Amino acid sequence: ASDVYKRQIFSNKSGAGGSIGIGFAVPSNMVKTVVDSVEKGKVIRPWLGATGQTIDSDLAREFGLKRPAGVIINEVYPESSAVDAGLKPGDIVLSIDNKSVEDRDVLRYRIATLALGKTFSMEVIRNGKPAILRFKTKAPLTKPQPNTLEVTGRNPFNGAVLANLSPAFALDNGLDDMKRGVVIVRSRRGSVAERLGLKKGDIVLTINSKKISEVKNFKDIVLSLIHISE
C-alpha cells in the first residue's frame, strides 16, 4: 500500500494465501530491513541483547513516572549492543531512535526495524534521572558454535538432540535468546528422552551435581556415567 505521494507504507502479507476480506500488512521499515539483509544472503535482524518487564500502573507509581509506559530492564547479555550502550538492569527504556517504547513488544519491534551496523539513541530513566545512551546495532551473537549432538546409548538422554545455546541459534530455533548453556533442541518421538519429559527449550544445568557448560562437557559426563554403570 502507498500514501498520497506513492511512497510504500505497507507490504501486503497473508500466510494462508487466500482472502476473505481481511487485510494483512507489514510496515515498510521492517520490509526494508529484511530486504537489506536478504541482499546479503540471509534475513538478519538487529538484536539488543536485553530483556525486561513492561511498566504497568503499579510500577509507574513506584518509579514516579507520569504514565505506565516503557520497559524496565531485568537482564543484559554479555557482548551485546545493550552492554555496549551501557544499559543496566533497573534502567527504564522510554524510546529508541526518538520513537516511544510503550511495552516489551514495541521494544522488540523498534529494534527489529533498525538498520544493522548503525548507531542509534536510547532514552532511559536511571535512578530516577533521564539519560541518553547510544548503541550500534549488531546481529545476534553466534558464539558458542552449536556443536549439535544426538544422544544414543543407555542413558536418560537417549533420543534427545542437544546443542550449545547462542543468541543466533536460539532465535533460529524459536528458543529464548537470553538463555545460555546446553539446550534440548528436540526429543525423538518414542525415545527415552521423550518418555522422561525432556522437551525443546529445556536447559541441562547439572548431571549428578556436575555442572554442564557445553555439549563436549555434557558428552564426557554422560559417557563416564555409562562406563561406571557397566
Language-model-derived ranges and their functions:
Residues 1-5, 227-230:
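Short, small-residue-biased leader/transition segments that mark boundaries at the very start
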Residues 2-16, 25, 29-37, 95:
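Active-site-proximal beta-strands of protease catalytic cores
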Residues 14-19, 60:
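A short acidic, helix-capping loop that chelates divalent metal ions and anchors anionic groups
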Residues 21-25, 100:
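Hydrophobic alpha-helical scaffolding
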Residues 33-230:
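C-terminal recognition in membrane/secretory proteostasis and scaffolding
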